[in-house]
Amino acid sequence: RSSDLLAFASINLNADQTIGGTALNLLATALAMVIAKGVNHSASAKLDYSNRVFVYDFGPLTVNVFLFIGLVALILSYIVLYKTRLGLRLRACGEHPQAADSVGINVYKMRYIGVLISGVLGGIGGMAYIIPSVSSWNFEVGVSGAGFLALAVMIFGQWKPFRIFLAAVFFALFKSLANIASSIPFLADLGWTQNMYNMIPFIASMIILAFTSKKSRAPKAEGIPYDKGSR
């Protein structure tokens, strides 16, 4: 439950979210390797598992269950954020926490809820990245920076669910292109290595963010610790 630690550090201790998130990212990777090696009773951080329960065949297509989970999460996130009292309070605590506090909303509670929900969704995202595609995973390898690419998707999507979805699809196309580049004749003829193709999503994200980041408006109080006494 690394999201619990991040929530406590950033909300109760007023720690910088970027520094706290980076520290927890390093901690989670190291902890996963320790657990994997403990399970294996060896120096290997690789775990083997069956992923068939998450993958289903629909005619010529192979679809994993996380596709449907993602679509449900997208719809629910929109409904919760824009159609419910909880969503209104969450957004208020991200935009104007002092104003929210003045009408009786518990800003600390709302921010805890937001961070914990984000932690759950992030965990599901990690499972979606690992489980359906392979039947074993080496925790020493990690996810090759996909988490940081997700941050770029959020910024490009301007913190709005459906825009984030479109941004995710856009970057997924580049990711898929990198995976199948060797089977496309004119790309294979370029003689690029697989590592060069794997760089494409990250290069694309930097180029796009360079042109769009100024127009992307984050919640006004994003990353700013809330001090009740500063009203």
Describe the predicted segments one by one:
Residues 12-24, 108:
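Alpha-helical transmembrane segments and their helix-start/interface "positive-inside/aromatic belt" motifs
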Residues 77, 95-102, 106-109, 182-231:
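Cytosolic-side transmembrane-helix boundaries in multi-pass membrane proteins
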Residues 60-138, 161-162, 166:
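Helix-loop-helix "hairpin" substructures at the membrane interface of multi-pass membrane proteins
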Residues 29-45, 122, 126-134, 168-187, ...:
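Juxtamembrane/transmembrane-helix interface segments of polytopic membrane transporters
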Residues 132, 137-202:
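Transmembrane alpha-helical segments in multi-pass inner-membrane proteins
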Residues 17, 28-83, 186-196, 223-231:
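Transmembrane helix-bundle core of multi-pass membrane transporters
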Residues 29-33, 67-79, 118-126, 150-156, ...:
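Hydrophobic core segments of alpha-helical transmembrane domains in multi-pass membrane transport
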